[in-house]
C-alpha cells in the first residue's frame, strides 16, 4: 500500500512555483415528448408523464435498506455509547440513550484509520490526531474579548505582522502537538477523507461535506484554529482574515498570501491564478477566455443566485440532512458549498500535483493558510444569509443541533462541541466580521431572451430520453412541471420550485463539474450572468474507503428563474447539462421538479 508523502514542505515556504429521501424520478424509459425530424427541436409545452418503474422501486428499496440498517444500528450504537468507559464514554455523559434521535456522534479517536486518497485505499495518508482520554464539553466564554475578522485585502501592516508571527509560531510547534500546523491540517483530512468511522455504524464514515454539517463543522474548525493562533502570540483579540472573494476588490488571491518568504505562503497553488488574476467562481478545472468585466458580471450574478434567488430555504442553503447511520451517498450540498466554495478549492489547487494539492483536494487543503481565509468568507456568507429575510433561518431539527465534533483547543485539550454551540458567533464564540459592501446583492441575473421569445432551440440529436445516462456531451431533456401554471406571490413564498438532478454518479477522487441551463439554446448557451444558467454541480476530489463510485444529488431553486424567463405557465422545461470537467464517466440517474416549503 502506497502512502502519500508527509507534508514536510509545510515547514518551509521560501520556494516559488515556476509559473430527506426523494420521491420518484424519471424512469429508465422516460415519457418524454420529442418533436419530429426537423433540424431543431422547439420545446412543446405539453404535459409529460413521468411514471415510476422498477428502477425507482429499486431506489426506494435501497433507501428502505439504509433506514433498516440505521434502526438496527441504533441499538448497537447506544450500547457503545452507554458501555464505553474511557475515551468515548467521557464524551457522551449528557446523552439520552433511549431517545429516538440520530445526530452524528463525535468520532472515537481510537478507531481513526489512514485517510483515503484513491479508491479502495490503494493510496493513503496518516491524518489521525493524538489520542487522549480527557474530553471537555464546550461552554461559551463570555469573558473573551470580541474579535473582528478583517478583509484580507485591506489589513494593516500592524495586523499583518501579528498574523505572520502567529502563523510562524504554529508552524514551529512539534508535529505531534495537536495545535501545530501539521496537526491542524490533518483535522480537515480526517473528517473529510474517510478516517473516522461513525460510532455504531462502522461501515459508514463521517463526512462533513455534501450535507447540513458543512457550515457548522467548518465554523468550529476555524474557531479553534483562530484561538490557537491568538494564544501563541498572547493576543485574545486576534481574528483570522477573510478572503473577500464575493466582491470585485477581493477577487484576486490576497497579496498577504503570495510573499514567498512569508509563513502565509504555500508553494502548491496554481501558478496561473496568482494576482492580479480574478477568481473564477464557476471554475471547474479549465480557464475561460473572458474579459475582466465579464468575469466580474458572472461572479456577482453567481453570488446572487447562490445567496438569494437559489437559496430561499434552509434545505437549499445548508444541504441534505445527515443523521447517524446515513451513508455518504444520495446527499446533496447546499448552495454555497457547491458553488463557489468547491470551485475556489479547485481554482487555487496546483494542477501539476498528482492530487491537485494543496487546496484542490480535501486531504491536503488545510496545509495552505489561504484555506482558512477562504473558509472565513464561507462562514461570513452564513452570517449574511440569515439577514436576508424570508425563510433564511437556521435549521431547528435536533439531529442537526445535537450533531457533535471533537477539536483540540488553544490549550491542547480535546473539546466536544455541538452544532447548537455555533449558531450565534458574536455571542457564543465572540467574533464578528468587518463589514464591507455587497455588490452581488444588487446583481440579479437577467434573461437572455425576451419573454415572448422563450422557446429554446435544441438539436434533435441532443435530446436524451433514457435514464440512467452517461454525460459525455451536451445533453438536453424535457422535464415535466407538476404545477404548470403561474403561481401567486404567496404560493411562491410558501413553496420554492426545485429542479432535482438525482443519482449523479462519478469517481469521487477526481474533480467533476457540469453546468445546468434551463430553456436555453443548446448550440449557443448563455453566459453565467443570465437567468437561463441555473447553476452547476461541482465536486472537489476526496478520499473514500471503498471502490464504489460516489453518488449524490443536486437541488436547484428555480422559482425566480422561471419568472425571469416567462415560463411559469409552461407544462415542462428544457434542461441542458454541459459537462465541463471529468476524467471518468458521469452518470445521471434522472430528473424531477418538486416543491419545497
Curated annotation (Swiss-Prot):
Q: Which reaction does it catalyse?
A: 2 catechol + O2 = 2 1,2-benzoquinone + 2 H2O
Q: Where is this cross-link: 2'-(S-cysteinyl)-histidine (Cys-His)?
A: 192-209
Enumerate the SUPFAM superfamilies for this protein. Di-copper centre-containing domain
Q: Does the keyword Plastid apply?
A: yes
An example GO BP is: pigment biosynthetic process
The annotated transit peptide is positioned at: 1-49, 50-101
**Keywords from the UniProt entry:** Chloroplast, Copper, Disulfide bond, Metal-binding, Oxidoreductase, Plastid, Thioether bond, Thylakoid, Transit peptide
What residue spans carry the Low complexity bias annotation? Answer: 54-63
UniProt-annotated stretches for the region Disordered: 49-70
Q: How does activity depend on temperature?
A: Optimum temperature is 45 degrees Celsius with catechol as substrate. Completely inactivated after heating at 70 degrees Celsius for 10 min.
Protein known as: Polyphenol oxidase latent form, chloroplastic
Amino acid at each position: 500500500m502506497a502512502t502519500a508523502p508527509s507534508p514536510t514542505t509545510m515547514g518551509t515556504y521560501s520556494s516559488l512555483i515556476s509559473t430527506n429521501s426523494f420521491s420518484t424520478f424519471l424512469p429508465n424509459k422516460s415519457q418524454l415528448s420529442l418533436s419530429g425530424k426537423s433540424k431543431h427541436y422547439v420545446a412543446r409545452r405539453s404535459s409529460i408523464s413521468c411514471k415510476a418503474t422498477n428502477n425507482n422501486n429499486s431506489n426506494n428499496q435501497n433507501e428502505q435498506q439504509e433506514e433498516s440498517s440505521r434502526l438496527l444500528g441504533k441499538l448497537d450504537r447506544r450500547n457503545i455509547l452507554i458501555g464505553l468507559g474511557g475515551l468515548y464514554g467521557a464524551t457522551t455523559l449528557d446523552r439520552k440513550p433511549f431517545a429516538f434521535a440520530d445526530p452524528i456522534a463525535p468520532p472515537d479517536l481510537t478507531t481513526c484509520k489512514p485517510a483515503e486518497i484513491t479508491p479502495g485505499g490503494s493510496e493513503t495518508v496518516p491524518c489521525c490526531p493524538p489520542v487522549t482520554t480527557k474530553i471537555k464539553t464546550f461552554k461559551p466564554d463570555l469573558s473573551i474579548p470580541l474579535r473582528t475578522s478583517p478583509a484580507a485585502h485591506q489589513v494593516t501592516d500592524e495586523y499583518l505582522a501579528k498574523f505572520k508571527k502567529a502563523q510562524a509560531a504554529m508552524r514551529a510547534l512539534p508535529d505531534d502537538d495537536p495545535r501545530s500546523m501539521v496537526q491542524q491540517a490533518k483535522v480537515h483530512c480526517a473528517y473529510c477523507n474517510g478516517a473516522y468511522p461513525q460510532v455504531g455504524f462502522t461501515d459508514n464514515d463521517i463526512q462533513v461535506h455534501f450535507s447540513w454539517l458543512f457550515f457548522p463543522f467548518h465554523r468550529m474548525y476555524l474557531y479553534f484554529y483562530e484561538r490557537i493562533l491568538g494564544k501563541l502570540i498572547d493576543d485574545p483579540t486576534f481574528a483570522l482574515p477573510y478572503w473577500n472573494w464575493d466582491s470585485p476588490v477581493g477577487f484576486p488571491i490576497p497579496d498577504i498570501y503570495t510573499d514567498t518568504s512569508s509563513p502565509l505562503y504555500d508553494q502548491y497553488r496554481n501558478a496561473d491564478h496568482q494576482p492580479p488574476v480574478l477568481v473564477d467562481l464557476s471554475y471547474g478545472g479549465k480557464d475561460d477566455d473572458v474579459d475582466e468585466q465579464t468575469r466580474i458580471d458572472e461572479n456577482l450574478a453567481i453570488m446572487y443566485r447562490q445567496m438569494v434567488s437559489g437559496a430561499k430555504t434552509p434545505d437549499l442553503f445548508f444541504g441534505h440532512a445527515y443523521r447517524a447511520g446515513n451513508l455518504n451517498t444520495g446527499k446533496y450540498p447546499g448552495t454555497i458549498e457547491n458553488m463557489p466554495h468547491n470551485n475556489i478549492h479547485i481554482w487555487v489547487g496546483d494542477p501539476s500535483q498528482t492530487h491537485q494539492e494543496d487546496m484542490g483536494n480535501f486531504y491536503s487543503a488545510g496545509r495552505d493558510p489561504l484555506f482558512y481565509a477562504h473558509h472565513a468568507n464561507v462562514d461570513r456568507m452564513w452570517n449574511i444569509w440569515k439577514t436576508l429575510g424570508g425563510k433564511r433561518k437556521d435549521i431547528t431539527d435536533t439531529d442537526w443541533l445535537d450533531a457533535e465534533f471533537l477539536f483540540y483547543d488553544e490549550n491542547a485539550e480535546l473539546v466536544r462541541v455541538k452544532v447548537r454551540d455555533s449558531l450565534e458567533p458574536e455571542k457564543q464564540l465572540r467574533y464578528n466580521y468587518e463589514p464591507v459592501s455587497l455588490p452581488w446583492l444588487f446583481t440579479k441575473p437577467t434573461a437572455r431572451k425576451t419573454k415572448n421569445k422563450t422557446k429554446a432551440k435544441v438539436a434533435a440529436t441532443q435530446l436524451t430520453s433514457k435514464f440512467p445516462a452517461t454525460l459525455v456531451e451536451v445533453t438536453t431533456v424535457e422535464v415535466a412541471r407538476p404545477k404548470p401554471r403561474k403561481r401567486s406571490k404567496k404560493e411562491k413564498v410558501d413553496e420554492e420550485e426545485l429542479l432535482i438532478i438525482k443519482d449523479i454518479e462519478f469517481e469521487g477522487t477526481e474533480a467533476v463539474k457540469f453546468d445546468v441551463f434551463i430553456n436555453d439554446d443548446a448550440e449557443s448557451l448563455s453566459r453565467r450572468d443570465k437567468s437561463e444558467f441555473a447553476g452547476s454541480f461541482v465536486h472537489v476530489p476526496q478520499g473514500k474507503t471503498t471502490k464504489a463510485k460516489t453518488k449524490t444529488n443536486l437541488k436547484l431553486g428555480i422559482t425566480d428563474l422561471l419568472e425571469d424567463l416567462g415560463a411559469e405557465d409552461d407544462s415542462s422545461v428544457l434542461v441542458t447539462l454541459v459537462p465541463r470537467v471529468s476524467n471518468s464517466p458521469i452518470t445521471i440517474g434522472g430528473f424531477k421538479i418538486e416543491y419545497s416549503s
